[in-house]
Amino acid sequence: SGNIMPRPSLRLVVFGGFSAGFMLFMGMSLQQAGLVYTTAGKAGFITSLYVVIVPILALFWKQSTNPGTWIGAILAAIGLYFLSVTEKFTVEFGDLLEFFCAFFWAGQVLIIGWLSPRIQSVKLAFTQFVVCAVLSLMVAMVFEDIAWNALVQATWPILYGGILSSGVAFTFQVMAQRNTHPAHASIIMSLEAVFAAIGGWLLLNEILSMRGLMGCGLMLGGMLLSQLWGIKSRTTASISD
């Protein structure tokens, strides 16, 4: 009975779900807008800088973490650079949008990390998606020309992105962050870039260069370091007790 979560107040569900949904909406919107003005590789790298931003912002929430997480986050960021940025790095307008996007992704991870132990996972995820969907529809109706034929032609990509990439993935995030430090979660989720590169190599016959492989290795190393350091710290603490 000690593991039963107390019933959250309606105010917490609404406020928390709106906060997480707004962060999700802003992160997705800025990411898509930035892609119009920059390359996919640079966008992937800059957006994933949330892996470093999360532990920094967590300090303001008084959520300290161990040195292994900081080192792991920096290794992951360096690995992302090698994996994502191949051309000469110059700052464009789209890069600034992606940079602001990274802060909203970091905020979403931190908010979910705070809410997930307090609100049932499915309830929090559902509220987050409803808020994000409503805000996205409102913005689309104002700034986009919505054509039914275009929606029909993009049915499967829309369903995949909405159900699997967003619905399933972000619900798993909410469930996992009940027992995971936000900084650790951000490092693990940054491995999205590694899976994308490997998937492109296996399924689309894309070339994975030595530079890309080195980037993947650094990111995997950063993830393992952050996790193993935490295990070592907990083991040492239990022995001393």
Regions found by a protein language model. Name each.
Residues 34, 39, 60-65, 115, ...:
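Hydrophobic/aromatic residues within transmembrane alpha-helices
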Residues 12-19, 65-77, 95-98, 119-129:
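Cytoplasmic-side transmembrane-helix entry/capping segments in multi-pass membrane proteins
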Residues 46-49, 68-71, 93, 100, ...:
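Hydrophobic core positions of alpha-helical segments in small-molecule transporters
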Residues 54-55, 87-144, 158, 172, ...:
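Transmembrane alpha-helical segments that form core, pore/gating elements
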Residues 65-85, 105, 134-136, 199, ...:
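Hydrophobic transmembrane alpha-helices of multi-pass small-molecule transport proteins
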Residues 15-37, 57, 82, 99-111, ...:
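Hydrophobic alpha-helical transmembrane segments of multi-pass membrane transport proteins
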Residues 6, 50-71, 194-213:
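C-terminal transmembrane-helix exit sites in multi-pass transporters
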Residues 1, 154-156, 190-241:
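C-terminal-most transmembrane helix of multi-pass membrane proteins
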